[in-house]
Amino acid sequence: MAEAALLLLPEAAAERDAREKLALWDRRPDTTAPLTDRQTDSVLELKAAAENLPVPAELPIEDLCSLTSQSLPIELTSVVPESTEDILLKGFTSLGMEEERIETAQQFFSWFAKLQTQMDQDEGTKYRQMRDYLSGFQEQCDAILNDVNSALQHLESLQKQYLFVSNKTGTLHEACEQLLKEQSELVDLAENIQQKLSYFNELETINTKLNSPTLSVNSDGFIPMLAKLDDCITYISSHPNFKDYPIYLLKFKQCLSKALHLMKTYTVNTLQTLTSQLLKRDPSSVPNADNAFTLFYVKFRAAAPKVRTLIEQIELRSEKIPEYQQLLNDIHQCYLDQRELLLGPSIACTVAELTSQNNRDHCALVRSGCAFMVHVCQDEHQLYNEFFTKPTSKLDELLEKLCVSLYDVFRPLIIHVIHLETLSELCGILKNEVLEDHVQNNAEQLGAFAAGVKQMLEDVQERLVYRTHIYIQTDITGYKPAPGDLAYPDKLVMMEQIAQSLKDEQKKVPSEASFSDVHLEEGESNSLTKSGSTESLNPRPQTTISPADLHGMWYPTVRRTLVCLSKLYRCIDRAVFQGLSQEALSACIQSLLGASESISKNKTQIDGQLFLIKHLLILREQIAPFHTEFTIKEISLDLKKTRDAAFKILNPMTVPRFFRLNSNNALIEFLLEGTPEIREHYLDSKKDVDRHLKSACEQFIQQQTKLFVEQLEEFMTKVSALKTMASQGGPKYTLSQQPWAQPAKVNDLAATAYKTIKTKLPVTLRSMSLYLSNKDTEFILFKPVRNNIQQVFQKFHALLKEEFSPEDIQIIACPSMEQLSLLLLVSK
């Protein structure tokens, strides 16, 4: 109780301070929180209502009972009191305060402190019980820890004893292992010595076998003995520090030489025996070409298994031991010598027979000769593979040597061929049929043959280029046209009539072929496309074909040029083709210009111009499919500066400057300024064709314009001269009063021009249709002519309005522009 009283002292002091502070709120007259009268009345009403505050209605009776049972040390009966006052009375009774009354705040705080102390004591009871319970467990754990420490001490003692025993046992085990290791090393040393001595001990065994008279390279024990000999040599060679190393190595080498000699003798004798047997079949040593090759290959293939196993062993060892490589080379040489001895005469005989059979047909000769050599090369490679497994370059050398015999026969024939068709066909055979079709598909076996074919192809191409130069000079540049070649437009009219008659017959008999299905010079035209249209991408149907478009109707130099280029295109290199094409096209253009002049002299100027335009169009269209540049570069030396410098140094005024020791020395100036210049010129044949075509079209347009409106242009030129004189101070004029410009004469002039157009225009259009036979081309070519005529008439109309009165204009009666347009109308 004394402790409780001590605890209540500070609490009572705190309550007193609180009450004093609360009193300050209400103190008069200095109030800390003054209230209004209304607020004061409200507080009094609340105080009166709070004096008899009941237990909250929402608090269940069960909770109240539970709270009471936990907080108060009294036993509640199962019967719930009927009123709250009974419950409170029992609570105060349990605290010994049933006689006390709480009327002031101090009494309430005292009661509350007492109640709280009682509750704290009740609450601490269970913790004290738990503390006592846990203390018991702690004592038990301390006892267990003591037992564990005792067990650990016993285990530590046991571990020390175990380590002592283990160390003793390990020492014994290591001693045993060391003894076993020494025993194993001694055994290995003995085996190693025995293994090394075995290579030396094999010498006597191998030497005995090699000296045996019954030893054969085909026996079962020869190959194993050979392998053992190789192993011994390899081993001894790799240990030069052994005792008696040079002696044993020399002895083993001698054994190897004996074995190699036996193998070489057997193989060489086998091959030579085969050759001698085959040669004995023909006393003249030149086997019959019909059955010789069959015997050559059958006999050798039958004998191949006898030596193939032995040769395989040699090839396997050739990379490691030089003696085997030398033996393999000797066997290769022997084999190839025997094959050359057999094949050389037979190939020469066969080539001679082919030459005699195809003496006049060079293409057939080249085809048959190349096919024969292809079979020979393939058969030789297959036969070689029957004997050997590794390739050798000596086989290709032999085949190249055999192919030279074919080349030696063909070359004299090639260099005497003069026809471009034959030479181009030979190029096609060698390049396409032989190199591309055969050699590329089997390059390994035909490599040697390809070298000879390439040399032959180069000779043919060289001959083709040479003959092409001559052909261009003789048949194009030097071509002398026959009268029939220049019979234009007569031949076109005749062919048109023939075509029309055939077309009429076709209408009568539909089953017969029309003229459009007839191809002239079919053999040559297969390599060329039909031409004549300015737009090759839009060819005309064959039913509207022009006679000038037929291959046979082309001017001979054009036909020859295009045929020549078509044959050269796939036969020679692009650079060479560019040079030849430029030369051929230039010569062809010059021949066309000459033919055009001749036709213009013999017939009319329009025929010559249209002839030139038509054939230039053909040239431009036909060279378009050649996917190459028709450009060549020419290099020239310009000596103009050298000449000027030489003249300058020869001038007497410069002689004193020869000996000057400065930059004004004449000799130094000559060396610096007189250096010749190298100039490069590019010649483009396609642009040359286009340039001449443009020039021909411009000449045609100018000539036709002059034909139709020349008099009007002369009249307007006079008027312009008259105006110029007047503007420069000359006498004034009245154009209608000039003798040559009177309305009646101007009327005659306009009527004559209109009549000329009306009468000669159909002739011009007819000629264009006959030569060009293409509405698009005709429209494009005639359009500038029509525009020029219209421009002249427009200027003429403007001149009439400016210089003549309306009455004079009516007298002149110049055709209107609408009339002129209708007259010049050409449907596209």
Swiss-Prot record:
It comes from the Eukaryota. Coiled coil: none annotated. Widely expressed with highest levels in pancreas and testis and lowest levels in lung. The modification N-acetylalanine is found at residue 2. Changing residue 620 to C: In a breast cancer sample; somatic mutation. Residues 525-543 have a biased composition (Polar residues). Signal peptide: none annotated. It is found in: Golgi apparatus, Golgi stack membrane. It holds the Pfam family COG3_N. GO terms for biological process: endoplasmic reticulum to Golgi vesicle-mediated transport; glycosylation; Golgi organization; intra-Golgi vesicle-mediated transport; intracellular protein transport; protein glycosylation; protein localization to organelle; protein stabilization. It is a peripheral membrane protein. GO terms for cellular component: cis-Golgi network; cytosol; Golgi apparatus; Golgi cisterna membrane; Golgi membrane; Golgi transport complex; plasma membrane; trans-Golgi network membrane. Residues 504-543 are annotated as: Disordered. The modification Phosphoserine is found at residue 663. Component of the conserved oligomeric Golgi complex which is composed of eight different subunits and is required for normal Golgi morphology and localization. Interacts with TMEM115. PANTHER family: CONSERVED OLIGOMERIC GOLGI COMPLEX COMPONENT 3, CONSERVED OLIGOMERIC GOLGI COMPLEX SUBUNIT 3. Involved in ER-Golgi transport. Also involved in retrograde (Golgi to ER) transport. It is linked to Congenital disorder of glycosylation 2BB: A multisystem disorder caused by a defect in glycoprotein biosynthesis and characterized by under-glycosylated serum glycoproteins. Congenital disorders of glycosylation result in a wide variety of clinical features, such as defects in the nervous system development, psychomotor retardation, dysmorphic features, hypotonia, coagulation disorders, and immunodeficiency. The broad spectrum of features reflects the critical role of N-glycoproteins during embryonic development, differentiation, and maintenance of cell functions. Belongs to the COG3 family. This is Conserved oligomeric Golgi complex subunit 3. The lineage of its organism: Eukaryota, Metazoa, Chordata, Craniata, Vertebrata.
